[in-house]
UniProtKB/Swiss-Prot annotation:
UniProt similarity note: Belongs to the UPF0598 family.
Taxonomic classification: Eukaryota, Metazoa, Chordata, Craniata, Vertebrata
Domain of life, per lineage: Eukaryota
The protein's name: UPF0598 protein C8orf82 homolog
Length: 218
């Protein structure tokens, strides 16, 4: 169990074990019950992260700010243990897995499992991008030259931890702020070619494109 999630995990367990708990049947023929125990002393839970970086129980009927998980400790524990799902269970529908002892926490995502939500305040140290509500504890160095604007969906991407797929989505509000720093080549208004950041001009490397485009859709 998540040792620190006293307010959150009991709620999830009550939901899963209550007489009203239901088996969820999603697309692709997948079905599960929150808190199911496929083998002794093992529990399985199922989650979903949206394009804003909000984490929900996957079978929540309403997915909004009110129903998402907000406890920073829980979010840090969950996302810091995130790995590709190679468990042999639900791999096609839940491509990522966060393990806590004998508890399996499966994750699917609207776009990417890592969603950058905030650019942390500048200081003497290099700037960092924080993701999925984890503050300083879930952050990577900000690399402006490696920002990837994708014309096919109008979204912005940035390098993420390799264990979480190597590419993260930038939340729309933050992407809008960063887009003011882009420069476009003459006659090519679709995609920027450079970014200006803190008085410097960087050519966009676009090196994330092969990794992102090669990934199967979630």
């Amino acid at each position: 169990m998540w040792a620190m999630s006293g307010a959150l995990r009991p709620w999830a367990l009550i939901l899963a074990r209550s007489p009203g708990a239901r088996t969820y049947a999603g697309g692709g023929g997948v079905s599960y019950t929150q808190g199911q125990s496929p083998e002794p002393r093992t529990r399985e839970y199922f989650y979903y992260v949206d394009h804003q970086g909000q984490l929900f129980l996957d079978d929540s009927r309403m997915k909004n700010f009110t129903t998402c998980f907000k406890d920073p400790q829980f979010l840090v524990m969950f996302f810091s243990r995130l790995r590709p799902n190679r468990s042999g269970r639900y791999e096609a529908y839940f491509p990522f897995l966060s393990l806590c002892g004998r508890e399996r926490n499966f994750l699917r995502c609207e776009d990417r499992p890592v969603v950058f939500t905030h650019l942390l305040a500048a200081g003497p140290a290099p700037q960092r991008l924080s993701y999925c509500g984890g503050g300083e504890a879930l952050a990577v160095p900000f690399e402006p030259a490696r920002l990837l604007p994708l014309a096919t969906n109008g979204r912005l991407y940035h390098p993420a931890p390799e264990r979480a797929g190597g590419v993260g989505l930038v939340r729309s509000a933050l992407a809008f702020e960063l887009s003011a720093c882009f420069e476009y080549a003459p006659g090519a208004p679709e995609l920027p070619s450079h970014v200006r950041w803190q008085g410097r001009r960087f050519a966009l490397t676009m090196d994330l494109a092969p990794l992102l485009l090669a990934a199967p859709p979630p």
